[in-house]
Amino acid sequence: PKKSYIEDNVFIGPCACFTNDRYPVRVKYKLRGPIIRKGASIGANTTFLSNIEVGEGAIVAAGAVVTRNVPPWSLAIGAPAKIKALPPKLRVPNRI
């Protein structure tokens, strides 16, 4: 959507849904899409509320519903997504 930013070496799985309006057609609200930092991986069928930042190297698991920022090099999993430590073996840059 408008006002979204995706940096380099990002993987976005199929059917990921990004929003840019937290209150659709209800109030005047500044549109703010997600910011996806370099090297992040977004799983299939994920949903992001507006104005969310996914940090560098973070992974969002398939089917997650992201309602808050995901710190760099962490794992977001579940609905709503909970933030977990990224396993050490996954703390490597994407090879896209």
Language model: regions and residue ranges:
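A glycine/serine/threonine-rich, flexible loop-to-helix segment
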Residues: 87-95
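Structural signal for interior beta-strand "rungs" in well-ordered beta-sheet cores
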Residues: 1-77, 82-83
